[in-house]
UniProtKB/Swiss-Prot annotation:
Cofactor: Mg(2+); [4Fe-4S] cluster
Name this polypeptide is given: tRNA-cytidine(32) 2-sulfurtransferase
EC number(s) on file: 2.8.1.-
Catalysed reactions, as listed in the record: cytidine(32) in tRNA + S-sulfanyl-L-cysteinyl-[cysteine desulfurase] + AH2 + ATP = 2-thiocytidine(32) in tRNA + L-cysteinyl-[cysteine desulfurase] + A + AMP + diphosphate + H(+)
Cofactor comment text: Binds 1 [4Fe-4S] cluster per subunit. The cluster is chelated by three Cys residues, the fourth Fe has a free coordination site that may bind a sulfur atom transferred from the persulfide of IscS.
GO aspect biological process, one term: tRNA thio-modification
Pfam families assigned: ATP_bind_3 (PF01171)
Note, other: The thiolation reaction likely consists of two steps: a first activation step by ATP to form an adenylated intermediate of the target base of tRNA, and a second nucleophilic substitution step of the sulfur (S) atom supplied by the hydrosulfide attached to the Fe-S cluster.
Domain of life: Bacteria
Gene designation: ttcA
Gene Ontology CC terms, in alphabetical order: cytoplasm
Localization, UniProt: Cytoplasm
Amino acid sequence: MNAPHMNDTAADAATLDDAAAPAGRPALTRREQKEAYENNKLFKRIVRQVGQAIGDYNMIEQGDKVMVCLSGGKDSYAMLDVLLRLRERAPIDFDIVAVNLDQKQPGFPEHVLPEYLKQVGVPFHIENQDTYSIVKRLVPEGKTTCSLCSRLRRGILYRVAGELGATKIALGHHRDDIVQTLLLNMFYGGKLKGMPPKLQSDDGKNIVIRPLAYVKETDLEKYAELREFPIIPCNLCGSQPNLKRAEMKALIREWDKRFPGRVDNMFNALAKVVPSHLMDTTLYPFQSLRATGEADPQGDIAFDEEPCASGDDAAAPGAAQPISIVQFDDL
């Protein structure tokens, strides 16, 4: 059965419950009206993008039990919030259970997530595992612990998913995370590899989904502020930040400011791969390629540089301007 798509009616309804002014409140000022309008657009956009991603990749199906991994950060809060809204209007039935892994980091506020989850009325499970001590014992002081911590966390969450009978594991990675991963793998790993919106886990037993795949991080930051989620800091472990990922994040933010549409184009390119124009012999049979003698309108242009966009293509609103290819005579 198809995954849930958001329609206009559902998107219109996906605003804050308290967005409407209480009876007897003075009329909103023009500034307040503009802010309310922009906030409403933000809510609709995020819900629409999550619904679209779910539908495009068939992330959630009839009868699924979705385990939403909740860390206490803005992304996982937003993911849970939007999935609960979508479930109310989806054409299929599916269950949601929120799961938090308490890794016994010093200063972690154990009461915050249970109180929040009880308030919103969603079933939840808190898994208590002291991975913090393991990581501190194995990783030298001052080194980044994120890689080992992630591996330990992944294995625990896979086990918990099986124990809870979850059919899908939902993670809160967003558009910027996906582009950052692509750049990290290109710059430091020498490979074209991103972060898929849906995958089979390495243990072969779980399907992992990323419903926020189409959502910008800046939108999630605004959403979390407006929804007033009880955010838990992500640096309680005392680990050094991942400097390479921080570098990619800063680069993407700078591009978004200076070259509107560039990051969107990079993200969209991940869904428009042309293996015949790359160099991976496992994806395209270059070695056995022979001339067929028949013209192909979609064939390669061997001698001319291909422009970034044809002159007939209308640029999407906010998209980066295509780069013109200028030919120079040999000197």
